[in-house]
């Protein structure tokens, strides 16, 4: 059987940026990598209901900067910023260095593979029929402007005795084209029959400018300065 390489891993440095961006000496590398893992695990667990897409970690000069990409920034920030301050204190304690937390809003959650996968998993846990959940997510993505999407679920679908895999695709998903912007994510649904795995591939178009163009597009948009009002004479 043909095996598939990880769509994000093969594009790192070409059209996909890393989610941890820092340099470390050989003696500190493993400790910092494990620290990143602990921070991500903690934040993913704490923000389970906040529709978190990804967590980007940077380590400038004996500190840690965490950027949380979420479709529901209000849930992360909390009332008057109370929740985000608690998260900052917790991350500082876990990482052992001063922490800064930034929030980046995901404008189109229907085109984010992680949010789509988590949404399907959530529906499966609520006993929604898997075909209906898959089809609804695919149709929403295509309506918003996706070039193509593929969704795959595997496990004891519908409580069947024998586990199987089913998938649904619309549009084109060119996995071998390195300039293709493929967003890939996985999730798990914990049902009474066992775990059902969910995989999502979303093709957003081709990136001609390479990694610098992608990084420029991912930066939060700057607000235009307000024009001075003319005084009425």
Curated annotation (Swiss-Prot):
GO annotation, biological process: translation
What InterPro entries does UniProt report for this protein, alphabetically?
A: KH_dom (IPR004087), KH_dom-like_a/b (IPR015946), KH_dom_type_2 (IPR004044), KH_sf_prok-type (IPR009019), Ribosomal_S3_C_sf (IPR036419), Ribosomal_uS3_bac-typ (IPR005704), Ribosomal_uS3_C (IPR001351), Ribosomal_uS3_CS (IPR018280)
Nuclease as UniProt keyword: no
Q: Annotated Gene Ontology MF terms?
A: mRNA binding; rRNA binding; structural constituent of ribosome
**Membrane-crossing residues?**
none
Which cellular components does GO assign to this protein?
cytosolic small ribosomal subunit
What would be one Pfam family of this protein?
KH_2
Could you describe the subunit structure of this protein? Part of the 30S ribosomal subunit. Forms a tight complex with proteins S10 and S14.
Protein family per UniProt: Belongs to the universal ribosomal protein uS3 family.
Its biological purpose is as follows: Binds the lower part of the 30S subunit head. Binds mRNA in the 70S ribosome, positioning it for translation.
**Which protein is depicted?**
Small ribosomal subunit protein uS3
Q: What is the lineage of its organism?
A: Bacteria, Pseudomonadati, Pseudomonadota, Gammaproteobacteria, Alteromonadales
């Amino acid at each position: 059987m043909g095996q598939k390489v990880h769509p994000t891993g093969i594009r790192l440095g070409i059209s996909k940026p890393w989610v941890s961006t820092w340099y470390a000496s050989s003696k500190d590398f493993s400790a910092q990598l494990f620290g990143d893992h602990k921070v991500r695990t903690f934040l993913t667990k704490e923000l389970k209901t906040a529709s978190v897409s990804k967590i980007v970690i940077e380590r400038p000069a004996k500190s840690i900067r965490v950027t949380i990409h979420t479709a529901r920034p209000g849930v992360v920030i909390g009332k008057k910023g109370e929740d985000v301050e608690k998260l900052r204190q917790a991350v500082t304690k876990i990482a052992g260095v001063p922490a800064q937390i930034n929030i980046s809003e995901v404008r189109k959650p229907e085109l984010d593979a992680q949010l789509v996968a988590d949404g399907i998993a959530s529906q499966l846990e609520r006993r929604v029929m898997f075909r209906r959940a898959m089809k609804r997510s695919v149709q929403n993505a295509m309506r918003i402007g996706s070039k193509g999407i593929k969704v795959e679920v595997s496990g004891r679908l519908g409580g069947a005795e024998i586990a199987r895999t089913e998938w649904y695709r619309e549009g084109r998903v060119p996995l071998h084209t390195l300039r293709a912007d493929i967003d890939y994510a996985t999730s798990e649904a914990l049902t009474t029959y066992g775990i059902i795995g969910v995989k999502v591939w979303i093709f957003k178009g081709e990136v001609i400018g390479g990694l610098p163009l992608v990084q420029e597009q991912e930066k939060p948009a700057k607000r235009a300065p307000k024009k001075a009002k003319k005084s009425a004479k």
